[in-house]
């Protein structure tokens, strides 16, 4: 590459390239006027009016750069140049033969009038992608496909500019033989023929020959109209996508030219790396309006390296036979599943015996000597199938959990031995402390000699090495995770991840799904494509394995995020300061007796005791959705050459369950797996309701963990239950005009903040159902802390309902069920003028007769009976009314069918069909019986007239159906004798 140039020179070169293209196209005057107007309207910046009169394009570039700045100048020039260039549809009007002739004539003219050639730059490709024709090198063999803009016609009302093309690729009505032949007499003649044919076709289609010009050139007014009436583009979205991608590449390559030192060669890898950096780590100086479009153009489901700085690394190691998948049915696995307390790290010592074999606790089905995944007698179906298809698996890519590489290298070079220089292979680096210095630390009195002294020195070096490589990382893990606030935050995040407990209750109450939100480095994202109920679709061992593996991967992501944050915060000055501190303290570290003490001392120095650890806890963990964990699981299996579709393994299947059964390289994996088992039990994610209560709706959101029970569960907290019932049912107004209303949003915010530290047990599994007597805190609501307020509100609501049901007029329905809870009004006026719209009741109707209420709700699932003053409603017959209208009970069925929705539809149809018959009933007087009508709801013709005659003898008490339950209790209907006395 050429010498590095400044950013300003790069911008001027880009602008000059665009301006030269405009000059060559002959549109400079239009371009300059549009550019001045565009900058005035878009940015409020006045450019010099004489900018189009400047002699050189480089001078114009400098003026644009000084007035607009780098980004605005380039974007404005690109946009105006694109508007003044021929569109894709106009380019398509000229056939391939005409294009070749035009290109030949252009090359000939360029040979006669050579211009100053521009050196090839990375911007030229980007400008061509934007649709702006860049200067072509005369030595290029490929012709330029863009026609001269001066030859395009000005008629935009014809089909030539409409963007419509026939199925064979040409315009409708254009003969195929119009295409010029290759044996044309001359280039100029053929070019004019092509242009004339295009103009003739356009004029014939639009019947407007006055708009064509003989010289084939476009005036300034035509160009102005081109911008206002643009031809339809058959692929506008694709073209816009290419333009925006070209803008991204231009910006990325400009940044590369400014930041790369030394300059990188132009290759696919370098462009991809710079594009990822430009997309996911944008420059803060870039205007905000150009940032959001970047994320639309990264390949879907492709893991970007720029933001996965730590998560993509893995440690490929041999799978131990003692892994979790080979411990089915063992006591060790059963104890891990029943973990009831947060274990502390063991006391590390040298000479630990590691037994990572299959052991005698499990029974193998086959005798495969080389297989790592051994089929066992007690394997679940998932492992049976996976091991059968995964006999070839020997290694697994365990996710990387080590400290930041800069820290690890500094510790090794400061406390153990500097790395050898590759250029000086003959010289071996000396250890940080010589044998004499270590012996003086181990045996200050000088009692050890010979081999004993050498063994003591080697033992102390081994202890320091073990602490640097293994135990320091484990000690740091324990400090980050084993803290009450961290356990609380992890359980809250996992409740969101699995849509469990209080998160599910929020969705039931406020209709808000909080499980789709994810956070990363302080930014919140919404993932509506997430499936938050994946864990609830499994049962038994499959659900347990899935939940444990998901929590294990969540802990891995959390730890990797913490180490990535630390890695980004480390610079050369920090490493230098760490080196100085460890150099001063290396004698003290070597004087400590065991790896546990040495590891704690190293972490004390690195974390400044707990200051840096506290900062990590503040930023972690991130809210994680199940789709992220699923993608991470698939990524790890894919890195290990394990096709999940054939062998359904999980990453936690390859991790041992105990430190003594694991090689030291996997001790950090063992720690996170043990913590995953504990969090699974502590969070109650595997809780299931008893069989006799499986259908209880309250069990869908129940969780026994300390975060939920008893304070956040309405089944235990009566005050919370009453508050949930009062949401949106009242509004309180103060004398000064302020109002208070318990809305779902207000309740949700208070509910999420509800937490009682006294009843939270972070390091032990202490669930409320088994230990209810040991929870002493008062159970309160979220918003209204006084239960008397809720009781008063409930009483007011009940008294209001009582008043409406007894004294009010109209139809009152339950807002939740649609059930009619009041007596329906009688429309006596309509009964007096009943005509063809009325009908006899259905033959199978209520035996006391009468029609069903016309205003009965059509969508009610259950219907309530009508009472009035403790009695069944009795029809009041007017002087001209023969047959009751509203006496029928709403819960009565029809013709062998139950009451409800179906009965209502049938009665409407019967009224329409029997309207004439009802009109005939109004003229009959002989069948009228006043007492029968009062007590039995009958008219001249009964409801069962075809079966029992006009006056059935069935008593009303024998045909009364049982009354369904009501919201408010009512009195018992009196007997017929008592009603007789009341009437008399």
From Swiss-Prot:
Q: Please give the residue ranges the record annotates as the region Disordered.
A: 131-231, 810-853, 876-984
Report the domain of life of the source organism: Viruses
Which Pfam families does the entry link to?
Adeno_100
Question: What are the Basic residues biased-composition ranges?
Answer: 913-923
Localization per Swiss-Prot or TrEMBL = Host cytoplasm
Where is it chiefly localized? host cell
For the region Binding to host EIF4G, give the residue spans: 411-476
Q: Which of the residues bear the PTM Phosphotyrosine?
A: 812
Q: Which InterPro entries does the entry link to?
A: L4
Extent of Polar residues compositional bias = 190-202
Q: Name one GO biological process term.
A: symbiont-mediated suppression of host gene expression
- List where Basic and acidic residues composition bias occurs: 148-159, 205-216
Q: Where does the RRM domain lie?
A: 479-597
| PTM per Swiss-Prot/TrEMBL | Might be cleaved by the viral protease.
Biased-composition ranges, Low complexity, are: 945-958
HAMAP family named among the record's database cross-references = ADV_SHUT
Functional summary from the UniProt entry: Protein that inhibits host translation while promoting late viral translation by ribosome shunting. Blocks host cap-dependent translation by binding to eIF4G, displacing MKNK1 from cap initiation complexes and preventing EIF4E phosphorylation. Binds to the tripartite leader sequence of viral late mRNAs and recruits host eIF4G, PABPC1/poly-A binding protein and 40S ribosomes subunits on viral mRNAs, allowing ribosome shunting and efficient translation of late viral mRNAs even though conventional translation via ribosome scanning from the cap has been shut off in the host cell.
Homology family? Belongs to the adenoviridae shutoff protein family.
The miscellaneous remark of the record is: All late proteins expressed from the major late promoter are produced by alternative splicing and alternative polyadenylation of the same gene giving rise to non-overlapping ORFs. A leader sequence is present in the N-terminus of all these mRNAs and is recognized by the viral shutoff protein to provide expression although conventional translation via ribosome scanning from the cap has been shut off in the host cell.
The name of this protein is Shutoff protein
- Organism encoding this protein: Fowl adenovirus A serotype 1 (strain CELO / Phelps)
């Amino acid at each position: 590459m050429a010498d590095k140039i400044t950013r300003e020179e790069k911008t001027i070169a880009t602008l000059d390239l665009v301006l030269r293209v405009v000059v060559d196209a002959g549109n400079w005057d239009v371009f300059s006027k549009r550019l001045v107007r565009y900058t005035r309207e878009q940015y409020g910046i006045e450019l010099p009016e004489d900018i189009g009169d400047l002699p050189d394009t480089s001078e114009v570039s400098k003026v644009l750069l000084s007035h607009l700045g780098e980004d605005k100048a380039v974007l404005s020039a690109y946009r105006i140049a694109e508007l003044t260039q021929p569109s894709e549809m106009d380019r398509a009007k000229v056939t391939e033969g005409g294009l070749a002739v035009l290109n030949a004539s252009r090359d000939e003219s360029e040979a006669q009038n050579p211009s100053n050639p521009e050196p090839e730059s990375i911007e030229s490709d980007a400008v061509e992608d934007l649709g702006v024709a860049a200067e072509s090198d005369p030595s290029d063999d490929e012709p330029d496909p863009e026609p001269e803009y001066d030859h395009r016609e000005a008629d935009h009302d014809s089909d030539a500019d409409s963007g419509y093309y026939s199925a064979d690729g040409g315009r409708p009505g254009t003969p195929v033989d119009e295409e010029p032949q290759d044996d044309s007499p001359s280039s100029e003649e053929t070019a004019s023929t092509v242009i004339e044919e295009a103009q003739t076709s356009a004029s014939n289609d639009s019947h407007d020959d006055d708009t064509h010009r003989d010289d084939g050139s476009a005036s300034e007014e035509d160009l102005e109209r081109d911008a206002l009436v643009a031809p339809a583009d058959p692929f506008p979205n694709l073209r816009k996508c290419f333009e925006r991608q070209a803008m991204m590449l231009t910006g990325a390559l400009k940044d590369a030219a400014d930041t790369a030192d030394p300059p990188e060669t132009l290759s696919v890898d370098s462009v991809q790396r710079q594009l990822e950096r430009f997309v996911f780590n944008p420059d803060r100086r870039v205007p905000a309006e150009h940032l959001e479009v970047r994320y639309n153009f990264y390949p879907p489901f492709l893991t970007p390296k720029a933001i996965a700085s730590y998560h993509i690394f893995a440690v490929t190691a041999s799978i131990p036979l003692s892994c979790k998948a080979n411990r089915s049915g063992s006591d060790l696995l059963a104890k891990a599943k029943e973990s009831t307390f947060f274990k502390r790290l063991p006391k590390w010592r040298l000479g630990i015996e590691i037994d990572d074999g299959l052991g005698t606790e499990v029974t193998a089905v086959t005798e495969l000597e080389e297989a790592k995944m051994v089929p066992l007698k007690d394997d679940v179906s998932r492992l049976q199938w996976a091991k059968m298809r995964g006999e070839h698996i020997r290694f697994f890519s365990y996710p990387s959990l080590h400290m930041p590489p800069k820290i690890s290298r500094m510790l090794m070079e400061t406390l153990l031995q500097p790395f050898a220089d590759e250029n000086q292979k003959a010289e071996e680096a000396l250890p940080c402390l010589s044998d004499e210095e270590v012996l003086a630390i181990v045996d200050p009195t000088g009692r050890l000699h010979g081999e004993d002294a050498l063994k003591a020195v080697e033992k102390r070096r081994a202890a320091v090495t073990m602490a640097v490589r293994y135990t320091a990382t484990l000690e740091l893990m324990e400090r980050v995770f084993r803290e009450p606030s961290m356990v609380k935050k992890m359980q809250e995040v996992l409740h969101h991840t699995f849509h469990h407990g209080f998160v599910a209750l929020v969705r039931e109450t406020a209709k808000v799904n909080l499980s789709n939100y994810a956070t990363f480095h302080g930014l919140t994202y919404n993932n509506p494509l997430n499936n938050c109920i994946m864990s609830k679709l499994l049962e038994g061992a499959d659900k347990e394995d899935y939940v444990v593996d998901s929590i294990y991967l969540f802990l891995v992501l959390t730890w990797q995020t913490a180490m990535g944050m630390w890695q980004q915060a480390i610079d050369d000055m920090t490493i230098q300061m760490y080196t100085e501190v460890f150099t001063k303290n290396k004698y003290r570290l070597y004087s400590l007796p065991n790896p546990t003490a040495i590891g704690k001392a190293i972490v004390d120095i690195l974390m400044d005791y707990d200051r840096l650890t506290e900062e990590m806890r503040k930023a972690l963990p991130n809210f994680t959705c199940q789709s992220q964990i699923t993608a991470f699981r698939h990524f790890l299996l894919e890195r290990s050459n394990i096709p999940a579709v054939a062998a359904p393994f999980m990453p936690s299947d390859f991790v041992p369950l105990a430190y003594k059964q694991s090689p030291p390289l996997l001790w950090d994996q063992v720690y996170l797996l043990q913590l995953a088992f504990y969090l699974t039990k502590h969070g109650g994610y595997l809780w299931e309701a008893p069989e006799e209560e499986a259908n209880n709706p309250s069990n869908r959101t129940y969780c026994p963990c300390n975060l939920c029970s008893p304070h956040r569960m309405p089944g235990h907290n009566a005050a919370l239950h009453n508050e949930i019932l009062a949401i949106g049912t009242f509004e309180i107004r103060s004398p000064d005009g302020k109002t208070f209303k318990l809305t779902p949003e207000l309740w949700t915010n208070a509910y999420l903040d509800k937490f009682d530290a006294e009843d939270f047990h972070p390091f032990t599994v202490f669930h409320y159902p088994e230990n209810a007597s040991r929870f002493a805190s008062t159970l309160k609501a979220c918003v209204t802390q006084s239960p008397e307020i809720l009781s008063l509100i409930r009483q007011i609501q009940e008294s209001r309902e009582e008043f409406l049901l007894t004294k009010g007029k109209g139809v009152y329905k339950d807002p939740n069920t649609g059930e009619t809870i009041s007596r329906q009004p009688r429309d006596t006026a309509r009964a007096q003028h009943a005509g063809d719209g009325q009908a006899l009741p259905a033959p199978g109707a209520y035996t006391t007769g009468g029609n069903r209420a016309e205003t009965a709700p059509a969508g009610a699932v259950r219907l309530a009976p009508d009472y009035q003053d403790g009695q069944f409603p009795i029809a009041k017959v007017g002087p001209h009314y023969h047959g009751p209208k509203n006496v029928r009970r709403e819960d009565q069925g029809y013709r062998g069918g139950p009451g409800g929705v179906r009965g209502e539809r049938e009665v409407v149809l019967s009224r329409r069909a029997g309207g004439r018959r009802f009109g005939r009933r109004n003229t009959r007087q002989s069948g009228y019986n006043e007492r029968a009508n009062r007590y039995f709801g009958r008219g001249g013709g009964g409801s069962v007239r075809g079966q029992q005659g006009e006056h059935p003898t069935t008593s009303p008490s024998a045909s009364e159906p049982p009354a369904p339950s009501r919201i408010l209790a009512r009195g018992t209907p009196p007997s017929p004798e008592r009603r007789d006395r009341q009437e008399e």
